[in-house]
């Protein structure tokens, strides 16, 4: 059974450089992963690298803590979609969830 098409190949390190992101995309194409998941600043690069490959570009929003406003998360998500993301992984604001404000 092949599980590669269920994997989100991810690189979220703040020190990641463009060549590492390009390598992430190459690996996703080589192994047939479902998507690459990156910080929103790398969405345009991934969208270009993965054009016509069938591999989705996923952007994290509110990463890593989730402790930002809903407006800021919505803006980051909208920008990522405009830049080529077809999936969004949002980090919840744990304090708000714990207090029932979600």
Residue ranges and their predicted role:
Residues 8, 46, 80:
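Conserved, mostly hydrophobic/aromatic
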